[in-house]
Amino acid sequence: TINLYTSSLDQIQSAIFSFCTQLNTFYEQALYLESLFDLFDMQTEDENCGTPLTEPIRTIEFRHVYFSYPATNVYALKNVSFVLDDRHTYALIGLNGSGKTTLLKLLMKLYKPTLGTILINGQDIEEIDTAGLRKRISAIFQDFIKYPFTAEENITISDLENANDLHRLSKVIDDAGAAEVIDGLPHRLQTQLQKGWNGGTELSQGQWQKIAIARCLFKQSDVYLFDEPFSALDAISEQHIIKRLNLKTKMSITIFITHRYSSLRLADFILVLKDGELVESGSHQELQKAGKYYSELIKAQIEPIDHLAQLDET
């Protein structure tokens, strides 16, 4: 009788424990229901609604642009105004959270300005066909996708209509500094870039960045956006790629985000952001001569290097 009582008690405890576990799991999953319902309630954006672009993008203007992300009253961008022209390379610099990536996303129409206007060739970006605009822009963000495809497919996926253009493919691989990466793969361009596949391999972050840069360049565009695509590369590789970019994209508008002093000097103009505001703009020489916030950012990079050099000498 005691054994039966003990066994029954164990079963009851087990059932209670299982019930509590299931209840806790249900509660955790219920927390996501509100987000799921919000997703269901979202209206699908009509990317083909608006005026199509009939001319290449020659100018981009931000006119008193403010932006705050959904569910927050804090502005990520505040009263930002500037004009960009084609045939120039622009660099964005600022501390983390200063609004650099946000600015690029607004340009891609991933978000709408809270206040102010963005003009493309003098036309309000909100009046322009979204799909047509994005076809003219090639971008690589920090969280770029690493497709479980072949190396070739990872590059040509940005422009499937010209995926068989082997000359263009070879050129962008060289421009992105990815030739050494491809040559080191067991099946070169036909290598699967994910372990688990027959003959597949996994790349380092720096190698992936070069593949992603080649992907961005394979799509011939009016505007090229690079959001810190060189973070895992050494300074020499970054300078080499930017120099090649300047040659390849000389008829376009190129914008890149970087924190490296050596690469900033290769830009025609630099936009300096601080806490969401555009505080300075000009060439590297002009900004250095002004001796303001840009100079502080550069000095913060150079001083540790000088200190290490002094330690080496001792």
Can you say where each PLM-predicted feature lies in the sequence?
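Generic structural signal for alpha-helix termini and adjacent loop/cap motifs
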Residues: 22, 42-43, 290, 300
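Pre-NBD coupling/linker segments of ABC/ABC-like ATPases
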Residues: 40-55, 287
